[in-house]
Swiss-Prot record:
<dbReference type="InterPro" id="IPR022838">
    <property type="entry name" value="GTP_cyclohydrolase_FolE2"/>
</dbReference>
<keyword id="KW-0378">Hydrolase</keyword>
<feature type="site" description="May be catalytically important">
    <location>
        <position position="155"/>
    </location>
</feature>
<comment type="similarity">
    <text>Belongs to the GTP cyclohydrolase IV family.</text>
</comment>
<dbReference type="InterPro" id="IPR003801">
    <property type="entry name" value="GTP_cyclohydrolase_FolE2/MptA"/>
</dbReference>
<dbReference type="Pfam" id="PF02649">
    <property type="entry name" value="GCHY-1"/>
</dbReference>
<comment type="pathway">
    <text>Cofactor biosynthesis; 7,8-dihydroneopterin triphosphate biosynthesis; 7,8-dihydroneopterin triphosphate from GTP: step 1/1.</text>
</comment>
<comment type="function">
    <text>Converts GTP to 7,8-dihydroneopterin triphosphate.</text>
</comment>
<protein>
    <recommendedName>
        <fullName>GTP cyclohydrolase FolE2</fullName>
        <ecNumber>3.5.4.16</ecNumber>
    </recommendedName>
</protein>
<dbReference type="GO" id="GO:0003934">
    <property type="term" value="F:GTP cyclohydrolase I activity"/>
</dbReference>
<dbReference type="GO" id="GO:0046654">
    <property type="term" value="P:tetrahydrofolate biosynthetic process"/>
</dbReference>
Length: 298
């Protein structure tokens, strides 16, 4: 009985000789260590790890090598500085495949405790979907951090239509009244202010920013704070009625189409980030489809 274990990837030849741009694994379950000014955090994520395969005569790469490298790196905080070493090691591990490029993507949810808008003693958890893409080659190293920020958007057109209907209803009911006290008007508004309401919806801004390879942290709190400050109506966690009332006021003060939200982000992000991509989606409550807009500044 033979004691040698066959290695088809090494000893067999491909049926069709051709270079491959990327080869590797996707959906790898990995622990992710995050370090921020808010403190450290351990979350569960999924990763994709790939290298190029320029050697046409090589049947396949050694995926177990990539897995072990990714597993070893998982004990370190996720930072561009540390990832550079991982990418370089991935390429070096496949010198027998003539590999010159590597890339890894991570996907996970970043958890953050956020305070209520008004209630000082109330807070709750928010989860932000995050992805980090790192790509290494002989000519460049690129890092893109992406986060999804949820917020509320109220349609400006719908708000104008609702105001008109409310005004018309008020005039129709008081057409023969020459003078009204402020208290009477206030009572009427309390009873009839919802005669027509504008449509609003949960919305999502997907924001990607470029990171430098020297960065020692991802900068998630700063990016999320920047986006939520620009949009002004981030979705909330724990609320009381006073917080919900404050949220309604913010929505009324920040009416926006999908175009408005995208332009706001474009203007505000340009102050802090040299390269970014924005994709905005409003999950319309009026329509069965979404409104979308995007912009790029690279």
């Amino acid at each position: 009985m033979s004691t040698s274990i066959p290695d088809v990837a090494v000893h067999d030849s491909p049926a069709v000789a051709a270079p491959l741009r990327w080869v590797g694994m996707d959906g790898i379950v990995v622990p992710v260590q995050l370090t921020t000014a808010d403190g450290g955090q351990h979350v569960i994520g999924r990763a994709r790890a790939q290298i190029d395969l320029p050697a046409m005569e090589v049947k396949g790469i050694h995926m177990s090598r990539l897995y072990r490298l990714l597993d070893t790196h998982a004990v370190e905080p996720l930072t561009p500085v540390g990832i550079c070493g991982l990418l370089s090691a991935m390429v070096n591990s496949h010198a027998d495949c003539a590999s010159t490029a590597a890339r890894v993507d991570w996907h996970f949810d970043w958890l953050r405790r956020v305070p209520a808008l008004v209630s000082n003693d109330l807070s709750g958890w928010r989860g932000y979907p995050v992805s980090l893409r790192a790509e290494y080659s002989a000519v460049h190293v690129q890092f893109w951090l992406c986060v999804e920020v949820g917020y509320s958007s109220t349609c400006p057109c719908s708000a104008a239509l609702a105001r008109q209907m409310l005004a018309d209803a008020f005039l129709q009911e008081h057409v023969e009244v020459s003078a009204l006290s402020p208290e009477t008007v206030a009572d009427w508004l309390r009873s009839n202010g919802s005669y027509a309401t504008p449509h609003s919806q949960r919305s999502v801004a997907r924001i990607e920013v470029a990171l430098t390879e020297q960065a020692v942290e991802l900068g998630l709190p700063a990016l999320v704070d920047c986006a939520e400050r620009i949009l002004s109506t981030p979705v909330q966690a724990a609320v009381r009625r006073v917080d919900e009332q404050a949220f309604a006021r913010l929505n009324g003060a920040n009416l926006m189409y999908v175009e408005d939200a995208t332009r706001r982000l474009q203007h505000g992000l340009a102050i802090h980030y040299s390269a970014f991509r924005v994709h905005v989606r409003h999950l319309e409550s009026l329509h069965p489809h979404d409104a979308v807009a995007s912009t790029v500044d690279e």
